[in-house]
Amino acid sequence: DSFIKNLLLDNLLLVDIYNRAKKLHIDADVRRAVMILELQQEKDHSSMESVKSFFGGKSKDFITAVDEKSIIIVKELEEGEGYADLDKLSHAILDTLGLNQNEETHIAYGTIVNELKEVSRSYKEARMALDVGKIFFGEKDVIAYSSLGIGRLIYQLPIPLCKMFIKEIFENKSPDDFDEETLVTIDKFFENSLNVSETSRQLYIHRNTLVYRLDKLQKSTGLDLRVFEDAITFKIALMVVRYMKYMETLEY
């Protein structure tokens, strides 16, 4: 177990990884991915045991922990198994353990790696996926590093740069100043790929009402969401604001 922990945390020299793996009869060149199950409350002995029994004590998968709130699974993949299987497995773990959506429980997984020395990278990716997932995909309980999209980019931006970007876009206004109605309208409009008719239908409002709201928004921000480029700028700005807010909560 200490070998796996040190491997995950990148505490081992390359030569040590292979020497110790050999001694412990751990195959070095097998496809693996790291999954992190994060529980809302501190994990108790039973949740760790449940995960272990879910995997049926298969000696090829390693289950461990490096902190109070998460359980780490280093999963070995069979030939032909891929991300779809990791996704299925993640949902199965949540279902089996009764960790359904009402608890703030998430599973994230990193990319599939081919060598033992790469396992720490998959672990770092799964960690990042958990964070990025909390900021941008709060409603998802399974998060894949490979599907973080633009959220992963934003997550790596320094806060001063974010503040500068928001100031340039909104000048003295902040997206937080928009009322609930405006924010719902914007979300729906993006959801429907900037389609005015479809958005107004889903919001149960007249097309002209939606056009009026978009015009009003354009007046206050200088951005016309019907124009693709402006819509992208606005979408990224909203995501940047969410990221900044999340980072603020961590500081307190």
Q: How does the language model describe each region?
A:
Residues D1-S2:
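Signal-transmission linkers at sensory-effector interfaces
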Residues N6, D10-Y252:
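Cytosolic nucleotide-utilizing catalytic cores of signal-transduction proteins
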